[in-house]
Structures are given as C-alpha cells and as structure tokens.
C-alpha cells in the first residue's frame, strides 16, 4: 500500500495498472482501487485496473514468458480488454477471467496444488522407504497412466519464495 501512496499523484487518464504479485482474492479491489478514485479518473472509462498473476517458472527451458498463457482479470470489461491487448503484444495466449478476484484465486490454486502434491510425493517416499519399495519406480510407473495422475517427485521440500506461503493467503482471507 505504501507504493500506492508514492505513485497516486502520478496517476493520470489513459493508464492501466496491473498487479502481478501473488496476493489474496480481493486485494486488487480492496487495496489498489481506493487510490485511483478521484474526480479525474473514472475506472473503466479513462483508467484501468487489473490483476494478472505472474506464472513464470525460473530455469524452465520449455515454458517462458511468451508461451505460458497469461491470465488477466479487470475490474471492468474495458479494463480486461485493455490488459489483454497489452499482454498480447508479447504473450501468445491471454485468457480473460471475469474479475481480479478470479485471477488472484487462480494463482493461489496453482501454487497450493503444487505444494500439496510435493508434500504428497515426499510422504510417499517416506512410506516406500519403510516398506522397502523403490519410490522412484512407483512414481515412474504411476506416471504411465495417461489420465488422472500428475507426476510429482520427492525432494528437499517446497522451492521458491511463494509456494510455501501462498496457501496462507487464502486461509487468512477466509478467516477475516
């Protein structure tokens, strides 16, 4: 919010503000929108506000900025359309969702799904060790099923700065 305190005086018509940082559902509307409401700025008319989660996987040689679909949710249809037009200049596929809250929730679902499945893979490895079964062989064999199974492997735990904390954003929001 302190960032908005610093930039609010520089906001002017024909700008688009897009929040990409992982956050709880509702934060774009609750924390950013109040700063752009004034006599000169009319949301969806001459200024736009959107949320578009960052979805980059650092070090991934297959998926990069241009070929990873981009999600965007604007506070108005014009905001979404403007955000899509901007991102479409550098990203192959831009998917518009109905609201910033939906876009915010997409990121939390993606990261919570990843956290749970990494934890499950680690638990399976512990169980396999106790049973004298090769966990890697179990996972590789299970991965041959063409549907209903997504391969996750055991390792040192959750990586990155966001995966471990993202489920807590949702928990906090639901308990406020």
What are these regions (language model features)?
Residues 1-176:
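Structural/interface elements that position substrates and couple domains in central-metabolism enzymes
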């Amino acid at each position: 919010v302190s960032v908005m305190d610093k930039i609010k005086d520089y906001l002017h018509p024909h700008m688009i503000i897009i929040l990409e940082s992982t956050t709880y559902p509702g934060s774009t509307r609750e924390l950013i929108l109040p700063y752009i409401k004034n006599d000169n700025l009319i949301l969806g008319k001459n200024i736009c506000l959107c949320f578009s989660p960052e979805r980059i996987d650092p070090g991934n040689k297959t998926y990069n900025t241009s070929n990873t679909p981009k999600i965007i949710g604007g506070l108005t249809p014009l905001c979404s359309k403007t955000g899509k037009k901007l991102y479409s200049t550098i990203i192959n596929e831009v998917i518009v969702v109905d609201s910033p809250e939906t876009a915010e929730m997409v990121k939390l679902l993606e990261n919570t799904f990843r956290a749970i499945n990494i934890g499950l893979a680690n638990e399976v490895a512990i169980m396999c060790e106790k049973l004298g079964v090769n966990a890697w062989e179990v996972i590789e064999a299970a991965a041959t099923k063409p549907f209903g199974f997504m391969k996750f492997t055991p390792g040192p735990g959750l990586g990155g700065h966001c995966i471990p904390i993202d489920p807590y954003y949702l928990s906090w929001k639901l308990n406020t």
